Structure formats: structure tokens, C-alpha cells
């Protein structure tokens, strides 16, 4: 998805918001996740959507933040508070930037709220 996004918007920022789904999936695909965000200019990580699973040691979103940095990503941030995420995105995003929300769980609610907030911001410019 991010490689395709880069093709359609080569001159603008790609901002990725990722909510890992399940601790076991994060563990099983950890190295893949660490290397798959390289086409994004900024990556914001949310808490793992557990889907009923217990946390697995060393496989939290903060661990993924460290992993992405080790794989060379320069702009990766774990953000626990959704309100802070919204404020950060609203300050960062510019016209024609692409914001991609990835994951399962409550990420769809965040995407819908972000869309509403950005629409409101643009109308008041």
C-alpha cells in the first residue's frame, strides 16, 4: 500500500498511522513490520489492538518503534494518546499529503475522526 502511495504522490508526504492487530501477529511478523514502512515519511504507532490476547513481552508498539528505527526509519513515533495523535497529524499534514491508517480494531474510528477534523480545518483556512 505504501509503495503504491509513493507512486501516486511522489512530491508530498506520506503519513502512516499503524495499529498492530494482536500481539502474536506482531511477534510473528515483527521483522516484516520493521521493514515495510520505508515508503512512509512519518510513521505513528498506536497501542496494539489485542483482540483478547494477553501482551507478549518485547512485542509492544514501543518495541516496534525501536525496530523501525533500527531498520533506518527516521520519523517513527509511538503515540499512546489519541488526542495527541490528532493534534500532531493536524499540525503535520499539508494539502495533498497522504494519510494512510493501517491495522484492525479501533483504527477505523480514528480514521473517521481524522477525516472529519481535517475537513473542518480545511474549511476554516
Where are these regions (language model features)?
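ATP-dependent carboxylate-amine ligase
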Residues: 1-125
